[in-house]
Amino acid sequence: MLQMGKAREPNFLILFFFGLILAFGISSEGSQIRHYKWEVEYMFWAPDCNENIVMGINGQFPGPTIRANAGDTVVVELINKLHTEGVVIHWHGILQRGTPWADGTASISQCAINPGETFFYNFTVDNPGTFFYHGHLGMQRSAGLYGSLIVDPPQGKKEPFHYDGEINLLLSDWWHQSIHKQEVGLSSKPIRWIGEPQTILLNGRGQFDCSIAAKYDSNLEPCKLKGSEPCAPYIFHVMPKKTYRIRIASTTALAALNFAIGNHPLLVVEADGNYVQPFYTSDIDIYSGESYSVLITTDQNPSENYWVSVGTRGRHPNTPPGLTLLNYLPNSVSKLPTSPPPETPAWDDFDRSKNFTYRITAAMGSPKPPVKSNRRIFLLNTQNVINGYVKWAINDVSLALPPTPYLGAMKFNLLHAFDQNPPPEVFPEDYDIDTPPTNEKTKIGNGVYQFKIGEIVDVILQNANMMKENLSEIHPWHLHGHDFWVLGYGDGKFTAEEESSLNLKNPPLRNTVVIFPYGWTAIRFVADNPGVWAFHCHIEPHLHMGMGVVFAEGVEKVGRIPTKALACGGTAKSLINNP
């Protein structure tokens, strides 16, 4: 059995790479169709011991976990039981090859599902990995519309690493203020910012105004929990001398997080559904939209329990860490660890954050990127003011989605459904990223970056100063419909001299990537998936304020689109004329 000790690390790597080679030889035989019937509705819940309204599925929060094997077809019958709101669900990390209408992005891939209506999502899960799903209309993710989506290897195949058990962890942040009040505040003049979350939730559970670790700090109020409450910690039950895989996904609306387990090193083996070169770390930073798998070995004192701690990074930590226990059975969960929880690194220690992120490279045998690209787009994200409203913009364009979904508008050639002028592909060379923007040319827009099928595209994400002096924030960017190679990161403005530093040897494949303050991030992808795809900051209020773009490729090759997906806006009339 695999041990976590350093002396066994080389043997583990050999097994890992051997297994990886076997994994790439998988077939699609024996795939299944997995059916789910979901009702989405608001309900009373107490995620952090304070009763509130959450958006749940079938009376559950978080929503039910989808578990399938690679090659399986997933069919979700989604019934909207919200009384006054539409709804969609995005299957984060699922590529939707052949089913771009099922991507679950309102105004891009489909119409919102109206109250009382039913919509069938039908798609194939291609690759094994750790994924999740969430609402993609307004700020419904912040309201609790999310859940886990786990894809195992095809039937009869195994992962390229051994483990004895598995723990699934979905991380989120929680506000006591309703999403409707948050949305109105973000769209007000002057803006009313949402503030930091009240609580970090681990599998939908957290504690507000009390701490399960109060015995180490007299300033904290101890939690008085029986264990059956919806806010009681989700305990990680483990047996001694075993290896466990912990799947970690972050569906936070705002918070960047740090995950650590007391006395237990983490072996990182997967990121965003792709295998990575394994490496040990004491903790991981995880940004909204990212997912990881880590292996731990329960080789510590078996008579003790150990802290699991999730703290905030990248923003001033006004939110207490989320806590739970790694419970070595048969110990009682009431037995607290002898030491306090791991201390979260300083929120503004970006060098530490970069050190972790830069260590992530592709596992041996992973697909390599094309040597050269056909097209390069530079995207500068800035915070701006438009007619007195605070917005986020990309190359001076703040995204406002049209009422007719792009997929249908382009499929039926509806030229007036959105701006036919493509957005800028570059920003001024003399732009000073170290000073606040001037806001002179910023506008609202909904144009599309269109690619030829097979085109190899580089995107350089460029960060800059916000409206307040000496302030730049972390932004995690998520691309729908594709995985991309992360070619590199850097400080300051990207220049031609940076070209030689790009990693073409073993860049990791991801679907979400971070851009650090005052820095740049370079990615490469192949436009080989016909459809229309969002590319946006995964921080919920930033997208709400316009921080995103739209990519399209080969829409003419998209097959039949279900009528209900396009029964709104200009496409509704087109469906009548072109049944």
Curated annotation (Swiss-Prot):
Pfam families the record matches: Cu-oxidase, Cu-oxidase_2, Cu-oxidase_3
Enzyme Commission number: 1.10.3.3
Residues reported to bind Cu cation 3: 136, 480, 536
Span of domain Plastocyanin-like: 33-152, 164-330, 374-553
Entry keyword set: Copper, Disulfide bond, Glycoprotein, Metal-binding, Oxidoreductase, Repeat, Secreted, Signal
Annotated Cu cation 4 binding sites: 475, 537, 542, 547
InterPro entries, per the entry: Cu-oxidase-like_N (IPR011707), Cu-oxidase_2nd (IPR001117), Cu-oxidase_C (IPR011706), Cu-oxidase_fam (IPR045087), Cu_oxidase_CS (IPR033138), Cu_oxidase_Cu_BS (IPR002355), Cupredoxin (IPR008972), CuRO_1_AAO (IPR034259)
An example Gene Ontology molecular-function term: copper ion binding
Binding residues annotated for Cu cation 2, in chain numbering: 92, 134, 538
Cofactor(s) named in the record: Cu cation
Glycosylation (residues): 122, 355, 470
Compartments it resides in: Secreted
EC main group: oxidoreductase
Recorded catalytic activity of this chain's protein: 4 L-ascorbate + O2 = 4 monodehydro-L-ascorbate radical + 2 H2O
Leader peptide range in chain numbering: 1-30
Cofactor note: Binds 4 Cu cations per monomer.
GO CC list: extracellular region; plasmodesma
PROSITE patterns found in the cross-reference section: MULTICOPPER_OXIDASE1, MULTICOPPER_OXIDASE2
Cystine residue pairs: 49-231, 111-568, 210-223
Annotated positions binding Cu cation 1: 90, 478
Recorded family membership: Belongs to the multicopper oxidase family.
Protein function: May be involved in a redox system involving ascorbic acid.
Binding partners and assembly: Dimer.
Protein name per Swiss-Prot or TrEMBL: L-ascorbate oxidase
Species the sequence originates in: Cucurbita maxima (Pumpkin)
